[in-house]
Amino acid sequence: MKQSSNVPAFLSKLWTLVEETHTNEFITWSQNGQSFLVLDEQRFAKEILPKYFKHNNMASFVRQLNMYGFRKVVHIDSGIVKQERDGPVEFQHPYFKQGQDDLLENIKRKVSSSKPEENKIRQEDLTKIISSAQKVQIKQETIESRLSELKSENESLWKEVSELRAKHAQQQQVIRKIVQFIVTLVQNNQLVSLKRKRPLLLNTNGAQKKNLFQHIVKEPTDNHHHKVPHSRTEGLKPRERISDDIIIYDVTDDNADEENIPVIPETNEDVISDPSNCSQYPDIVIVEDDNEDEYAPVIQSGEQNEPARESLSSGSDGSSPLMSSAVQLNGSSSLTSEDPVTMMDSILNDNINLLGKVELLDYLDSIDCSLEDFQAMLSGRQFSIDPDLLVDLFTSSVQMNPTDYINNTKSENKGLETTKNNVVQPVSEEGRKSKSKPDKQLIQYTAFPLLAFLDGNPASSVEQASTTASSEVLSSVDKPIEVDELLDSSLDPEPTQSKLVRLEPLTEAEASEATLFYLCELAPAPLDSDMPLLDS
């Protein structure tokens, strides 16, 4: 074998060992010369290896062969691997062949596949990978923080939505209750009022009139007498049926004096007195006490040929003038089926009670209680409503237009002026000489703004209407005015406007006699004092 410096020593020793003939019993070439065989491993390790490789370890020899790329050949017979420990072991390499020693230069020892340059390249790649991973991590953290912010905002938005839904539901419930309350009032045809009883007019056929508080004056004490004409043509103006109002006179004299009072017949049509008499005696309704109800004459309209006694009481002498309690009935008309006498008593008693001190305090207390009850009802009461009522409420064809309200106001003014032109019975001579009752008091009842508000009329309209009526009656003495002109003068009233009046409970200092009479514009005069008279 040619020695070559490029061939490793192990390969040279192995080639010599296989080529020598005295070692053929331990190691030799195979039959095809492509590999070599180790026949007896134990004897080869003990006898041959120490001579060539300075050791007798067969495993170390096999490891060296593997380092140079030799492979162990496995024999397969009938699919079974033969494993004989003492049998021959064959090793093969592509460049280790019999008779071709020049191929030994191609056999190289296996070295590590890692190189410094490759390690540097891998380190750079690793650095890039780590940097990219860090960037991804930063982006992930940013995304996570943004996601957490979005979650918090979403939670706050959902909370706000839930709160708004709750508020909306509460508002819907409040609106539903308000609508139920309004529809309940419309269904029952009831309005929240201050529980003030409004008297009914006895007349059921006349037009509706405004509620005006008349000026009640004391009768004159002179000896001038007025006689009522018995004929329909004397002192009357020809006109058709104007009104069916009733003037009720209370007999305030003794029974003996009542017999001397003349009976004046009343027919179905109204009687209009002379304008000169109307100016001196405005519309007066004299109310009788309860103990004298049996002597009170009642005049009913609509019945023909039924006489009734009417009189006015006056003072017998100049020392004690007559003081008569006169109250004007409210002019609101309404249909009723009650007895006129019973209804008259209740109305008169209702008006008289408003003039008392204790009754007025009770009346103001009832107003406060009504307001508190109304507030409690609005705050705590539950209302039930039929759903069909909502359709009827908003699609109702029965609605009052402002023009209808103005027409009603005009009709009320017509009724008021007609009442002013109705017959006023003059005081007879016998009535002026009769005795006066000590329990009667003549009171000048002027327009009260609070009560006018409760009656549905503003104070300005009440005072204006009262002043206009008085001036028209006083001016009729000098110049007669036709009934048509008097009616036309009241056809353009101002529309009624609602005004809010705040009621406060009275203290003990405010509930004194002078304060209460000042509030009601009543003069707390004694029974025997003289009242100022209006200019007749």
UniProtKB/Swiss-Prot annotation:
Residues 360-385 are annotated as: Hydrophobic repeat HR-C. PROSITE patterns: HSF_DOMAIN. Residues 311-325 have a biased composition (Low complexity). Residues 7-112 bind DNA. It is found in: Cytoplasm; Nucleus. Residues 119-192 are annotated as: Hydrophobic repeat HR-A/B. A motif (Nuclear localization signal) lies at residues 108-122, 195-210. It comes from the Eukaryota. Residues 300-337, 407-438 are annotated as: Disordered. One of its GO terms (molecular function) is sequence-specific double-stranded DNA binding. GO terms for biological process: positive regulation of transcription by RNA polymerase II; spermatogenesis. Keywords: Activator, Cytoplasm, DNA-binding, Isopeptide bond, Nucleus, Stress response, Transcription, Transcription regulation, Ubl conjugation. Residues 326-337 have a biased composition (Polar residues). There is a cross-link at residues 2, 82, 135, 139, 151, 210, 218, 237 (Glycyl lysine isopeptide (Lys-Gly) (interchain with G-Cter in SUMO2)). Its main location: cytoplasm. Pfam families: HSF_DNA-bind, Vert_HS_TF. Belongs to the HSF family. DNA-binding protein that specifically binds heat shock promoter elements (HSE) and activates transcription. In higher eukaryotes, HSF is unable to bind to the HSE unless the cells are heat shocked. DNA-binding homotrimer in stressed or heat shocked cells, otherwise found as a homodimer. This is Heat shock factor protein 2. It comes from Homo sapiens. The lineage of its organism: Eukaryota, Metazoa, Chordata, Craniata, Vertebrata. The gene is HSF2.
